[in-house]
UniProtKB/Swiss-Prot annotation:
Lineage: Eukaryota, Fungi, Dikarya, Ascomycota, Saccharomycotina
Sequence motif DEAD box, residues: 175-178
One Pfam entry name: DEAD
Summary of the function given for this chain in its UniProt record: ATP-dependent RNA helicase involved in 40S ribosomal subunit biogenesis. Required for the processing and cleavage of 35S pre-rRNA at sites A0, A1, and A2, leading to mature 18S rRNA.
Domain notes: The Q motif is unique to and characteristic of the DEAD box family of RNA helicases and controls ATP binding and hydrolysis.
UniProt keyword terms in alphabetical order: ATP-binding, Helicase, Hydrolase, Nucleotide-binding, Nucleus, Ribosome biogenesis, RNA-binding, rRNA processing
Gene Ontology CC: FAL1-SGD1 complex; nucleolus; preribosome, small subunit precursor; small-subunit processome
PROSITE patterns xrefs: DEAD_ATP_HELICASE, HELICASE_ATP_BIND_1, HELICASE_CTER, Q_MOTIF
Organism: Lodderomyces elongisporus (strain ATCC 11503 / CBS 2605 / JCM 1781 / NBRC 1676 / NRRL YB-4239)
Stretches assigned to the Helicase C-terminal domain: 238-399
Name the record gives this protein: ATP-dependent RNA helicase FAL1
Length: 399
């Protein structure tokens, strides 16, 4: 694992709105964590806490409700995972912590991070997600899982079936909270929360936190410590952003083909707004003998898992996807993101291009525009207080 870009990481501005004097822990040793957890942290590849980790981990361990926002790729998942692992009772086989995520892939990735960090702790964790046989979930839950990472629909299902006991849950984590609180997830989360014991600790984590999300989390948090980054400073530092004017929609494909040789230098993700567009673009690229893989929400879970594993391992170099892939999926080698379509939701821009600069590395984002996209590009620049430049004629100058 690459080290954090310490200069970039230290630029993040934190505003502790509900409390003053949040202590900053510059080393993991200063947190006085369990020796076996500390061993897992170092084995995973961390050397020193990132800005969010140095502030939020101890707040979580202390039992405070915590709202944490930080740049994509600064170790938010490890932040709540370390806090959670420190306070769990490894001798009890009851479920003690519940993590909710907006996508199956993210829930599975969180499970893997927890497994690695808790490698020396004898902690059982399980990804409870849709797309899998519920019978398998029931069997695994009956074996005893101290941490469950899942999607709201499936988690609520196993709670209602009484296959997941909530009596001993002391921590609820909402990851990528802004997406979780969109229509469809909000009601399920409230329903899950009603089944949890009174006084359960709530940890809210996201790269972006809207005013609406902060309002909603206020309904089930008590005097939370807020560790926030100003919106315009989130996730864009260290990522070079460009646009290519294509005039017509039809010209985008030719432009993408011209860029293909540069896509495979490391790994690249191409985002489209619809599943139909993903399938169409994948077919067109393959007809031109370009090697690409595709992923969207209509695929079976086994197929999505296989594609993710291939992409993680580097066997496939170019992935075409909808926004199902944009949030929190951690593949270290990605250095280029192409927005074939500008995102429909401004908040998703940050999640998409944040993939290209994981853990403080430098990345490049290229936006393919038609004339009608120009207004939306200007709106993105204003929203994030950033400047998106026109792509130089020599692509090698920016890659």
């Amino acid at each position: 694992m690459d080290e954090f870009d310490r200069d970039l990481d230290n630029e993040l501005e934190f505003s502790h709105k509900s409390t003053k004097g949040v202590k900053v822990h510059r080393t993991f040793e200063s947190m006085r964590l369990k020796p076996e957890l500390l061993k897992g942290i170092y084995a995973y590849g961390f050397e020193a806490p990132s800005a969010i980790q140095s502030r939020a981990i101890m707040q979580i361990i202390s039992g405070r409700d915590t709202i944490a926002q930080a740049q994509s790729g600064t170790g938010k998942t490890a932040t709540f995972s370390i806090g959670m692992l420190e306070v769990l009772d490894s001798k009890s086989k009851e479920c003690q912590a519940l993590v909710l995520s907006p996508t199956r892939e993210l829930a599975t990735q969180i499970q893997n991070v927890i497994k690695h960090l808790g490698d020396y702790m004898n902690i059982q964790t399980y990804a409870c997600i849709g797309g899998k046989n519920v019978g398998t979930d029931i069997k695994r839950l009956q074996q005893g899982q101290q941490i469950v990472s899942g999607t709201p629909g499936r988690v609520l299902d196993v709670i209602k079936r009484r296959n997941l006991s909530t009596r001993h849950i002391k921590m609820l984590i909402l990851d990528e909270a802004d997406e979780l609180f969109t229509k469809g997830f909000k009601e399920q989360i409230y329903e899950i929360y009603k089944h949890l014991p009174p006084g359960v600790q709530v940890v809210v984590v996201s790269a972006t936190l809207t005013h609406e999300v902060l309002e909603m989390t206020g309904k089930f948090t008590t005097d939370p410590v807020k560790i926030l980054v100003k919106r315009e400073e989130v996730s864009l530092s260290g990522i070079k952003q460009y646009y290519i004017q294509c005039e017509k929609e039809d010209w985008k494909f030719d432009t993408l083909c011209d860029l293909y040789d540069n896509l495979t230098i490391t790994q690249a993700v191409i985002f489209c707004n619809t599943k139909i567009k993903v399938n169409w673009l994948t077919d067109q690229m393959r007809k031109q003998n370009f090697t690409v893989v595709a992923m969207h929400g209509d695929m079976k879970q086994e197929e999505r898992d296989a594609i993710m594993n291939d992409f993680r391992s580097g066997n496939s170099r170019v992935l075409i996807s909808t926004d199902v892939w944009a949030r929190g999926i951690d593949v270290q080698q990605i250095s280029l993101v192409i927005n074939y379509d500008l995102p429909l939701d401004k908040e998703n821009y940050i999640h998409r291009i944040g993939r290209s600069g994981r853990f403080g590395r430098k990345g490049t984002a290229i936006n393919l525009l038609t004339k009608s996209d120009t207004i939306e590009l200007k709106a993105l620049e204003k929203y994030y207080s950033t400047k998106i430049k026109e792509m130089p004629s020599n692509v090698n100058d920016v890659m």
